[in-house]
Structure formats: C-alpha cells, structure tokens
Amino acid sequence: MFLAATTGLVLAAGSALAADEDDRTAYVRTDLVSNLQNLVQPKDPDLQNAWGVANAPGGPLWVSDNNDGLSTLYDGNGVKQGLTVTIPLPAGQSTPPTATPTGMVWNPTGGFPITVGTATAPAIFIFDTEDGTIAAWNPTVDPIVKGRSTATRVVDNSNKGAVYKGLAFGTNKHGNFLFATNFAAGIVEVYDNKFAAKTLDGNFSDPDIPAGFAPFGIANIDNNLYVTYAKQNAQKNDVIPGAGLGFVKVFTTDGVLIKRFASRGRLNAPWGVARATQNFGQFSSSILIGNFGEQGDFAGWINAFSGGNDNDFLGSLRDANGKPIAIDGLWSIVFGTFLNSDADTLYFTAGPNQQQNGLFGKIVAQPRTETEAMK
C-alpha cells in the first residue's frame, strides 16, 4: 500500500555502530495473531497489513487493518474482541477497493464531534487513511449491529491527493489537535477539535531535511511530537526503503522544531516510536524507533536511543543469540496499557510479505545468561 535545534546524532553504518554488541538483555519475540494459518494459531483473516494502534486505558487494543479497510480489536494475549469497525472510503467511492486506514488515536476529550443525522457525539477513536480521509467513531452515532459498525468520514482531502500515513493527538495553549502526516504533500496537517484545518505557530519544518523525504510516522511522547521521515517514491504515495533512508525530528505541539533526533545510519523508513518503560532490560527508559523499511540493511529493526539531550544511539533489540530482531513490515510499537496486557512488554503490528499479510505480536526483555552472552 501503497527552530532552535540541537544537532542530532548521525549514525554511521559501519563498525562504529557496535555499541550494542555486548548485550546484557535477550529480547524475546512472540507472534500472537496473524491472517496466515501457518504463522500463528488461531488465524484471523481480518488482520491484513496491521498498521496503527490505539486504546483507551484498560480497553482493547484497536488495530488499523490497511489491506481490508477495517479496525479489529485484541487483548494482550492476541484474543480477538467482539467488534469490527469498517473505515469509510472517500465520498463517491464504493468498494472494492476498501479504505486504507493507517494511523489511529484514542480521543480522551469531549471534543471532535461526529454528527450523523440528528445525533452528535464526540469521537472515541479517530483514523486517517492513505485515501486522504480522516474518519471517527462513536457507537452513539455509528451503531453496532451484530458486532460490526462503520466509522464516519469527517475530513476528505482525497481530491487534493492527500496520502495520510500517521496520526497523533496533542495539546497546546490553543487547545486539542490532531496531527496527520500527509506523505504525498510532505507536510504535517493540523486539525482542531472540530476537525477544521488549522495553522499553528510552527509549521513542522526543518531546512536540513533533504528534498524527497516526507513526514511518515508521528507519535506523541511526553507532549512532544516525534516525526519520522522516509524517502518518497516517484508517485509520492509510498516509501523507498534502504539503509540510511530516514530521519527523526522532535517538535512541540505548536509545530516548532526542538531537536534533530536521529539521522540516516540504521534508520530504514522509520515509522513506529515508543518510550520504553523502566523495566525493559538494557534499553529501559530509552526511545525506541522501529524501521518499516522492507528491504536493505536494518529492515524491520528496532533501535534504541537515550532520549536525553544527547540522543545517544544505544543499540538494537537482539535475541538470545545476539541477532537483531527483524520484523518484516514493522509498523506500530507500543507498551501495554490495554486489556490483559503487560506494562513492560513491547507490542507490535506489521504487514509482512510486502504488506499483503498482517501480524500482531509482542517482545519481552529477559536477562541473558553468561553462555548466551558469549555467543
């Protein structure tokens, strides 16, 4: 499917990156759910190119299924919950094809109203799509019938060629906002709590970003927005993967550049961003950056950075044999705050096999034995 800045860390791709060779932690990956029968049991055919995720605290984890226009729900054990939500296509379009949801947020406020007929209610979950739309859901206006519901389209920029790849929620002195990465236009779009487009004090710009790179993923960490950049293809609707093809910048929720966080090196079309908990092995409390890039060196790796003022590269998540964990088509990385999840476990979604399939899994930290450390 298709600026008072501090100098960030530029990662070399060679032997200088051996900071993680002496790993103290083995990271163990477990796949929980997939649409592939031979990968995980039980199989879920709806989980196709599992992309963005969101949840209310303690509620199920909602997953955007990019290949079939759905959002499906799971607990921390991978057990599917009894609701499936369809994401609508742009106005005037009909299936097939289906919509292509990407980013998603949970709305903790009473804003972002959805109106259907005479009924109005605040959005609970909000999605953006590669179709150039934003959709929102609340069962008051989007009724559930036999375990299924359909979200309501609230923004439609499909006729402008918008291609949204990520979505974040944030607050600043002006109020509550949505931040959508428009990969085709190379910008971060901003919407207020009535889904109206807005311009903030900053414009999410950094003159150091080379031409041909565009905002890809976006995550709110400690009320700062981490924006990842990937290289555009000729059509500007998808990424060109490859070692060193990526940047990460940090902005305020006003769109003002704070710092250049990471550049090139082990980045390969980075999308997912998460802050590790204090109990995640040697990379506790670090900022984790996940590579979506499906080809080239570092494809599907998860890299750790100090997250302080120095943005030091700390290493990559590795298994008990010291091999980097590589997840084909890696998208979201989040720690457990949802139903039956563990707070110190890293959960992930992915679209393996060129985004044709879907995967939801988890990674836990375990101390490495002395024998393992010598391998």
Residue ranges with predicted function:
Residues 2-12:
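Bacterial N-terminal signal peptides
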Residues 17-375:
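Sequence/structural signature of beta-propeller domains
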